[in-house]
């Protein structure tokens, strides 16, 4: 589970169905002891802890890896780290890494599933899937929806994964971004001014300003960003009836979105976080039987 590109529409539908079942109260537990390791080389709150909650709800034994306290500090490669975990009996790894496509060196080299929890500016498939679940719960469909992805498109793995998947599922994607943060390589959407999109779209998907990937992050610059490119209270009032606000979080309040809108009636930001657990349960349940005897292996009951 590395990118959204590898999933067909049918596979996406199956994962979302499993996630909906979990959201509706379905329970599933492992029938045998199964170890899963979480390796986060970048800071994370939502993705890391929702994966851990998902793993524990499935009855998995969780190994939380700390790069600072591991042999990575002695020069051990990512490949050797994964092979070590595989050798001691770990059945899957969840990896967040600052390097784009870190998994290219691991594909076809290890024999356990790799669940990509975000690679640099590249991909974030489980974030995309939880966003898809949130949209599906709201509208019951993807076909014909208009989605605005707003903000730092160039540096956003969320923008890439969502634009590709939503286009595949029949939605129309628009981008709104400061000129210096446009991603001309992302061909899944059309750029338009934010104020043109506000009254037209069904989903306003805001992106975090990634100050850790920029050289400057000053209060006055962020205030200007909010006024020009953020979802202000005035812009929210012009949004289409029935439209919703989404954000992958963490939220920079009064930068990407006015603080009072984070939990407004349109906002689904915390619903997205809740859905993250269900989607990650579905992805784990799908990945693990493959390594333990195929999809028919009764690992979960």
Curated annotation (Swiss-Prot):
Known EC number: 2.1.3.2
Binding sites annotated in the UniProt record for carbamoyl phosphate: 46-47, 96, 124, 127, 249-250
Job of this protein: Catalyzes the condensation of carbamoyl phosphate and aspartate to form carbamoyl aspartate and inorganic phosphate, the committed step in the de novo pyrimidine nucleotide biosynthesis pathway.
Origin: domain of life: Bacteria
Protein name as annotated: Aspartate carbamoyltransferase catalytic subunit
HAMAP family in UniProt: Asp_carb_tr (MF_00001)
Pathway(s) per entry: Pyrimidine metabolism; UMP biosynthesis via de novo pathway; (S)-dihydroorotate from bicarbonate: step 2/3
Family: Belongs to the aspartate/ornithine carbamoyltransferase superfamily. ATCase family.
UniProt cross-references to Pfam families, sorted A to Z: OTCace (PF00185), OTCace_N (PF02729)
GO biological-process terms attached to the record: 'de novo' pyrimidine nucleobase biosynthetic process; 'de novo' UMP biosynthetic process; amino acid metabolic process
Main EC class the enzyme belongs to: transferase
UniProt-listed PROSITE patterns: CARBAMOYLTRANSFERASE
Gene that this polypeptide is encoded by: pyrB
Organism this protein belongs to: Bacillus cereus (strain ATCC 14579 / DSM 31 / CCUG 7414 / JCM 2152 / NBRC 15305 / NCIMB 9373 / NCTC 2599 / NRRL B-3711)
Keywords, alphabetical: Pyrimidine biosynthesis, Transferase
Quaternary structure and partners: Heterododecamer (2C3:3R2) of six catalytic PyrB chains organized as two trimers (C3), and six regulatory PyrI chains organized as three dimers (R2).
GO molecular function, one term: amino acid binding
Enzymatic reactions: carbamoyl phosphate + L-aspartate = N-carbamoyl-L-aspartate + phosphate + H(+)
PANTHER family for this protein: ASPARTATE CARBAMOYLTRANSFERASE, ORNITHINE CARBAMOYLTRANSFERASE, MITOCHONDRIAL
Residues the record lists as binding L-aspartate: 74, 157, 208
């Amino acid at each position: 589970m590395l990118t959204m590109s590898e999933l067909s529409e049918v596979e996406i539908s199956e994962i979302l169905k499993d996630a909906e079942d979990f959201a509706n109260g379905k329970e599933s537990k492992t029938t045998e002891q199964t170890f899963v390791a979480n390796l986060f080389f970048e800071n994370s709150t939502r993705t890391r802890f929702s994966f851990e909650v998902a793993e524990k709800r499935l009855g998995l034994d969780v190994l939380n890896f700390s790069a600072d306290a591991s042999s990575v500090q002695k020069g051990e490669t990512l490949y050797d780290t994964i092979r070590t975990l595989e050798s001691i009996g770990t059945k899957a790894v969840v990896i967040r890494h600052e390097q784009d496509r870190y998994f290219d060196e691991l594909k076809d080299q290890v024999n356990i599933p790799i669940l990509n929890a975000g690679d640099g500016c590249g991909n974030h498939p489980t974030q995309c899937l939880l966003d898809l679940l949130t949209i599906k719960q709201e509208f019951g469909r993807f076909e014909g929806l208009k989605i605005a992805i707003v903000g730092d498109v160039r540096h956003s793995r969320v923008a890439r994964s969502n634009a590709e998947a939503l286009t595949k599922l029949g939605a129309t994607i628009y981008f709104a971004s400061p000129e210096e943060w446009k991603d001309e390589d992302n061909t899944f959407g059309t750029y338009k001014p934010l104020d043109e999109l506000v009254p037209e779209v069904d989903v306003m998907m805001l992106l975090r300003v990634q100050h850790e990937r920029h050289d400057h992050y000053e209060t006055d610059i962020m205030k200007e960003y909010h006024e020009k490119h953020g979802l202000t209270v005035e812009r929210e009032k012009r949004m289409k009836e029935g439209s919703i606000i989404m954000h992958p979080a963490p939220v920079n309040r009064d930068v990407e979105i006015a603080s009072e809108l984070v939990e407004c009636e349109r906002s689904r930001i915390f619903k997205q976080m809740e859905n993250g657990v269900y989607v990650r349960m579905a992805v784990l349940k799908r990945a693990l039987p493959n390594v333990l005897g195929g999809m028919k292996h009764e690992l979960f009951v």
